[in-house]
């Protein structure tokens, strides 16, 4: 079992987010660099990100993971409502929590994300000038101005979302949809289609029982909130914050060429690595994991001027 401490911290709007602190090994009482890590989409911290956090901690970097608001162990109502704009703010509150720890050097904290949260992490780093670095693995970039959503599908979802809003105001429960359809399509008909691999992943997690707070569903309002989120406008403000982009070479959810356009848009210090033969969801799974993680550790240590 990974060695971690259960922790919690407050957000500015009064929620309690619950996570796990993986302290840097071999620190010898010295303050260490640290990284904020969140699981993407409907995934919870029991899955996927613990291995990342353990690896960083073994390399002398403290790691904080937490369930995003309204998912897993964290507070937030309605449950399973994806609010990416609020998640951006939560990265900053997680930073503040880490910076308050006597074992962490507040001048050496950065952000990490994968898939949807890879874009959220970039957005957060662009807006929070305290972040010393950001690592983005397979960011979803289809929400950019270069890839507008079909207007007819947008209007259809907005109409349904407004009806659901009216219903909730009458005291009814929120309307929920599956996060991914069985054929891999987006349940609302617009936005990124995560593919059959995503459907199989969430079904596998649900069946395994390893994450008792996990749900395969999202509120319908989640998709209206995605529509109102425009991260590419903010990411342009990343400035001189060093960024590492890791692109899954066989990504069919967020195409490698789209991710490269994002990389080219960044004007500050940056590094790109392509994980050959890796898909969107298995980029940091099993074979090749250590090599890809070593690249990220090297990037952090070089950026912060730390010895290897």
From Swiss-Prot:
SUPFAM superfamilies: alpha/beta-Hydrolases
Pathway assigned in UniProt: Secondary metabolite biosynthesis
GO terms (BP aspect): antibiotic biosynthetic process; monocarboxylic acid biosynthetic process
Biological source species: Penicillium crustosum (Blue mold fungus)
Short name of any one Pfam family annotated for the protein: Hydrolase_4
InterPro entries associated with the record: AB_hydrolase_fold, Hydrolase_4, Polyketide_trans_af380
Catalytic activity, EC: 2.3.-.-
Keywords carried by this UniProt record: Transferase
An example molecular function term from Gene Ontology annotations: transferase activity
Name listed for the protein in its UniProt record: Polyketide transferase claH
